[in-house]
């Protein structure tokens, strides 16, 4: 009998949406909004390839959604990266078909490491904040890619 793993057909992740191309960044910014009108689920990957700064410096990466490309709501706040943190990947899912059964307050950002999975919109963007407490040019290299389903 053959190995059952040989017959597994991988499921495609979906259309790739670049929310933040891989680059070294030294300051916070908003990424470019990407239309997600025909999407009901987003698989979002944060790929941090380098953090070259002091331990007290931080990187916070967010994914925001918008119904109108004007009002932005924070849906994902990835786990905070220390300035001397190791390279790594973080993954989160937003699913419009699973909105949940409770009201979600969205007047402020989610806490670090929190996903608001039912929060969805016609537009999506990445956003990041870099704290440089040592004043010596904190630098983090990362990308954010969403796979639209």
Regions found by a protein language model. Give the residues of each.
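Surface-exposed, low-hydrophobicity beta-strand/loop segments enriched in small/polar/acidic residues
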Residues: 1-149
């Amino acid at each position: 009998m053959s190995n059952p793993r040989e017959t597994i057909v991988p499921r495609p992740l979906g259309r790739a949406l670049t929310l933040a191309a891989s680059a070294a960044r030294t300051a916070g910014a908003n990424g470019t909004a990407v239309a997600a009108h025909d999407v009901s689920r987003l698989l979002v990957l944060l790929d941090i390839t380098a953090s070259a700064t002091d331990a007290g410096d931080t990187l916070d990466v967010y994914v925001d959604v918008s119904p109108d490309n004007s009002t932005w709501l924070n849906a994902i706040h990835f786990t905070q990266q220390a300035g001397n943190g190791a390279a790594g990947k973080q993954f989160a899912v937003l699913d419009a078909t699973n909105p949940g059964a409770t009201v979600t307050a969205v007047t402020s950002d989610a806490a670090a490491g929190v996903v608001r999975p039912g929060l969805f919109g016609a537009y999506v963007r990445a956003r990041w904040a870099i704290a440089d407490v040592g004043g010596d040019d904190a630098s983090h290299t990362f990308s954010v890619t969403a796979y639209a389903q």
